[in-house]
C-alpha cells in the first residue's frame, strides 16, 4: 500500500534553477519540501553555461529568491552585447544594446556547475527548516500512482515517496514529463543541439582584450557561412577568468546538412574574428554537449498533470529567438509560480487546484507569450529556410558597398533590437 511510503508535502525533482526556485519559494511558505537531485553533486549532471537574466517584468528573479546570488554564484555582469554576421572574410557587426537591455534589470554570465552547487547549499538550508532537505545521487525514474492518480515518485535508490505536490524540474529528458504524457516533442525540428567549450583566460586578459571593466563583461553572437548552411549560430560569453564559447543549431538542420557540431564549433574557434581575443592559442578546460527544446514549438501550454507541475526544460521553456537566448530565468519564474500556485490552492482548501492555477499564472505573467509568440506562426516557413541569413549575407556582400552596408545594416540592427520583429523572425 502507498500509505506505507514516506510522505512529504512537496517533492521537487531536480536542483537546477527551476527546481531551486520552486523549493526556495515553497520553503518560504513553510511547505515541507524534499528535493531529489540525480547528480552526486548538484551541477555535476549539467554541462551548460550561459546568461541568466533578471527581467523587470518577471514576478521572480533568482536574486530575489537567493540573496547573495550575484556575489557568490555568478561570473560577470554582461553589459555589452553584439552579433557578428560573417560571409567569407567579411563581417558586419550589430550592436544589440537595445534588445539586451529591453526588460532587463541585470544579466550575468554563469557556469552551471558552480551555480547549481551553490544553489543546492542554499536550498538544503531552507528546506531542512521545513522538515525536508536535498538528497543528491537519487535518480527519479517515474511517477507513483494509486487508482490511476499521481500520488508521488519512484526512484532507483529509494522506496517510492508520496507527495501532495510534485515539481518536475528534471531537465530536457524529463522522466516525469514523459511518464505523465506531457512531453510530446519528438521531431528533430523541435530541438536544438548545443555544444560548448570553456576556454581558460585570466581575468585581467579578458578585461584588456574585450575592453570591459573589472566588474563588467560582454556577449558576442555569430552567424553566417562559417556554419556551412546549418541553421543556428555561435556565442561567446566572458566569465570571471574563462570564456564560454559554443554553438546552438537546429537538430533537423544538422541532420539535413550532415554536419558535425564539434566541427562547426572548431570553425568558430579557428575563425580570424575570434583570434583577436584568443590570439593564436587557447586551452579548453571543458567540452560539453546538450539538447535543448525549442519553446516556439514545444513550450507546453498546460504543463501539469494531477499533482505534477513541470518547469524549465522539462516543460519546453527555453526561449531562442534570434539573438534572444533565455532559459534559466524562465525556469526560475516557472518554479516560483508553481510554488505560488500550490500555496494559493492550499489557501483555497483544494491542493488539486495547483496545476490549473500554475497554468493560469504562466499566462497572466506573460511567460507563455514570450515562449510561444503568436507572430512566429505567421513567418515560420520564411525564417526556417535560411532567408534571414541570406539577407544578412547579401548585406555584407552588397554591390552598393559601404553605402549599402550603412543603409541595410542599419535596418537589420533595428530589427535585431525590436522585440516585436524578433517574435516574427526568431531564427538568424
Task: Please annotate each region the language model reported.
Residues 100-121, 254-260:
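Short beta-strand to alpha-helix junction loop
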Residues 227-230, 240, 253-336, 350-352:
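FAD/FMN-dependent oxidoreductases across multiple families
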Residues 122-274:
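Predominantly flavin-linked oxidoreductase catalytic cores and closely associated redox partners
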